[in-house]
Amino acid sequence: MNTHFSNLHKSIVKKHFLPMATAVLSLCAASSMAQTYNNPVIQGVADAGCMKYAGKYYLGGVATYGDFFVSSDLVNWGERVHVFDFDNQWTKGTGAKNNQIHANEMLYSGGLFHLLFSANYWGKDKHIVHITHAVSPSVTGPYREVRDDQWFENRIDPMVFRDDDGRLYLYMVKFTDGNTIWGRPMNHDFTFSGDAVQQFSSQPGTWETYDNRVAEGPFVIKYRGRYYMMYNANHTSPSFGNYRLGVCEASSPLGFGPGGKYSWPVVGPNTESIDDTHADLLHYGSGHWQPLATDNGGDTGNASARIMRFNLASVPAGNVYLKLIQRGGISVKINGHAINAGKNSDYQLYPINHSWLKKGVNTLVIEQPKEGKGTLSSIALYDFGNEKADDLLVTPGQPNIVRGPNGWEWWLVYMANKGWQRSQYIDRIHFSNGRMVVDGITGPNTAGFHPAPSKPQYAGTSIADIPFSSTTYLLELTMSSAQREQGIVIGDKTVLLPDSMARNVAHEWRIEKNHNLLTVWIDKVLVTQHQRVNVTDNKVKLLGDSNNYHIDHAAYNEGFDEYGPYFSGWDTLTAGTHGLALAKGMWLKGAAANNYELSVQTDDNDATSGTYGVMAAYTDDKNYVSVKIDAAKAQVVIDHCVKGKTKMVVKPLATEQVVYPDVKYTDSFEKQYRFDSDTYVNALLFPHNTPDNDPYAHDLGIEAAVKEHYQADVASSQEIAWLDGDTWRPLSTELATSSNPAWQRITFPTVKTRGLRFINREATDMHRNIYRIKVGSERQTVNQLRVERRGKDIHMYVNDRSFGVVTLAHDVPTRCGLLSDGAAKVTVGNVLYYVVN
């Protein structure tokens, strides 16, 4: 029997807690002993599919040639096994072989493993761009096509979603309106039960159409009663660099449409975020915008060379980097100093020696190779200050969303490019205020806290050794039995395998016990939903003779996930339709632990007073760490109490955030930017670079790269209004100083609103003028608070924005929970908690 325990009893056996007597409060970037990971996790693999089964992950697709990579932790993929060979009647005699296997989809259903993928062969002999379907009784194959005389469906990027009622849906991409996402219902045997239904195509005039009309790579999950589809938009090629991941929400599996799309990409190239926060010194080195003075560089001996001149008011004292995006062989010199750009196409940030720069006029010489094949796509110069630059990472795509090893976390497995090399990456998915948020794109040098996937506290092939010491936990079982009546027993509740499910084959059980509420899925079918259970102990037992069951995999992890009316175990607090109503006091839930995550959504209903939040770490009333929101002052208050003495740190909630027009309220005549909750807004920022000439929106050559695309005064071109209830009111603004000269900033008296509207002031002005802008806000009424404790370090976040790290002097077990002073009417919409291993 393979059994693994880790820290399972740690919070139980330590009855006497060490006080946090010599703990220290640190709100700077603190080092953490938590295990991290380095992207990419698999080099050289592009469009792929990923499946979790019985505690292992299987990944295959482009450049795996019919193989699966295998991992137990999403990070290490050393095992590789061959599972499939492309050999059928409809590809015979063509060049469509194993190298044409694209965009795998793998899943387990009723004793069979299913492999779907798209052949993507555009040969001179034949075009073979179809989806096929193969099966195997073993996860490691060999897989055989169900029919070898014809393909399964058209055209690319298959994904099969099983709803919690057991119904199956195939999502795919057809070449109808550009690349368009469609969905089609299926029977349990993977035959079709209805016609395909168009979901959506890419939306003109948005981030989805920076180049081509492409919507592809759909992946669907259901979480907390909502359906989420992640997808790709724009051309996949790194020569464009525009590929991004978006999300669409729906209330039904075939109900995805333009109105459900997030207005923004959830994962994009980090080149964009650099320009959002750093001014390009080639244009703004003098403190204000200046055009690049260019001329022909024939005197260099290369007629295709260009000379660019830029002005610096002073030589930057920080870390300076030159961004160079080029397609092979570009040569660059700064004031005569050569940049070793290499001969290959690449996205790079090159560190620049301060001695190479000078106050006043500086010169860039850019030469193409003499054969004239090199192309410059983008060039910029940045002052990063004390920051170190990350690698330039672009074209995130082909998403797969899987549960992490501990069963609580969600992880995104996807491809991305570092330069021109495409590989597999992983990043954590969070749900913040109901929205899907991705902690990425990340590389080895990405700033911030990016812990590795958490492992289960117990993993093995038996449940007999699990103590079930907590009243809240997740148990995952992959097991089979020949018994006609088979299932599990918890307290007074028996959950049976439905008659419609086959016997004597493995089934995947997901059992969530949240105090006295029980939820069970079998093969992703919801068979028990938040039913009350009375227990004398918390153990899960197998129905009948346990010797008649074969357990392939069991994983146990303490924690709970609750939302809406499904709260339990909070003592005197009660839940309504929309969540848990906070009263005055403090409430703790779960055993003490040394490593955990707590994520809480709060809605203060436009409170004008009161503090509320989370108890991040609690030993006793004289030793704790709390993170609270002060509604009246729009602040985050962090209290660290040691032996009754409290050290308080206060940070403003105010932020400036990039927003995109909401397509539901936007057309060619006006743009509306909407907020999910009431937001207190007091500033707007507009990029001086025109959205019609975004350098990331086109396949640029050197001439286009240096062309002037500057708008001196964006704000005055717009009539701006804010939404007051259901009434639009004009916004009275004034010009303000911007910390980034690449952005124009205007301010106004704070307004509480859910929307802003922009209309071109001149009726004859048909330009876009604005698209991506920044909104400055004091606070919002709905917030997601998250704490991640890893040993001594407690990382704190509000709306996925870091508010620092508290570092304890001793790694002692603590509890966590909710708190409020009772002055604000606060509703807790969801809580996710789990012990981290």
Label for each model-derived stretch:
Residues 34-52, 75-107, 123, 140-162, ...:
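Surface loop/turn signatures of beta-propeller and other carbohydrate-active proteins
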Residues 365-373, 417, 543-547, 758-766, ...:
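Short beta-strand-plus-loop segments that form exposed binding edges in beta-rich domains
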Residues 294-313, 464, 595-597, 655, ...:
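Short beta-strands within extracellular/lumenal beta-sheet-rich domains
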Residues 303, 317, 325-384, 502-504, ...:
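Beta-strand-rich ligand-recognition modules
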Residues 371-381, 549-554, 764-777, 826-831:
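Edge beta-strands of jelly-roll/beta-sandwich modules across compartments, strongly enriched
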Residues 274-286, 291, 386-387, 434-661, ...:
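Extracellular glycan-recognition regions
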Residues 560-561, 606, 653-732, 737-779:
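Aromatic, loop-rich ligand-recognition surfaces of beta-strand-rich domains
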Residues 46-65, 102-123, 145-148, 157-184, ...:
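Hydrophobic core segments of beta-strands in well-ordered, beta-rich domains
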